[in-house]
Curated annotation (Swiss-Prot):
Organism: Caenorhabditis elegans
Name of the protein in its database record: Zip homologous protein 4
Effect after changing residue 26 to A: In vv138; 75% embryonic lethality and 35% of surviving progeny are male. Chromosome segregation defects due to impaired recruitment to the synaptonemal complex between homologous chromosome pairs during pachytene
Chain intervals annotated as zinc finger (RING-type): 6-50
Polar residues composition bias: residue spans: 163-175, 220-235
Keyword Isomerase: no
Annotated spans, Disordered: 149-175, 201-283
GO molecular function list: SUMO transferase activity; zinc ion binding
GO cellular component: chromosome; synaptonemal complex
Amino acid sequence: MEAVHCFRCYKFPSKQIEFYLTNCMHMFCIECERLCHPPEEEPLKCIQCSKTPIRIVKMGPELPMTIKSMFTPISEEINQYTRDLTRVLTFQHRQRASLSTFLERKVAAFDRLRDAYSEEKTKKEHYKKQLEEAYHLLKSKEHEISKLKKQLAEQAPPPQTPPRSNSLKVASSRSLETPSMMRVFSDSMYETPVQIQRRFTKAQAKAEAEAEAPAKSPGSKAQTTKCTSNYQSHPPASFETPIHHPPKTSMGFTTPANPPHMFPYLKKHEAQREKHKEHRNSQ
């Protein structure tokens, strides 16, 4: 700073001359500074403004920053302030630009949502109107259907119970006389050839005896019951074992319930039955 000088003698600072600064902002050289010290024990007094007491600080690199800033050239201060102000303005401008961009995106999104809401609201009103029309149409159709049903009920004749025909009676009796296929199959499957031959002989003899006996009226209940029981006790011819074929040694209980390991026992049992039959015939 070129304007620094002593307030009393107007000397300029140099390396050989020391300068001092008072708290009342007056500068003195080392010679003038001595005049601020009174001869007696009195407080320091400024020789420029006569202020007392004062504090005196030696000028140099050890000065506080608050005092050094007063000696900085004004151009440097302006440049520093300009740089600081520019940095502050740049920071604030970036903040405002970021916030403005965010708000613009939000406004655009809000506009899109508002348009979508308006479109969905219009669709909802349209669907609601269609639903109301369909509901009224359904009610009218239900009313027409109930009206037509009522008219048909009034025009229809009273129901009559038809008499049961003889054909139904005959069909029911035939269904009762028809043997169970499962029973016939199971009976023929679990009988031995000897038992089948014996049963067939008895049935043939019984049929011959009935043929020789006088025939009864077809409406007899006892005859119908007897024929039904006899018919149900014999399987159809397709399920019977042929009699003219000689029985094989492997014939018998050839079912999953009687595996082949039972054949020796069955063969022995049949041999005993044949032996017992021959003994009875000889007597």
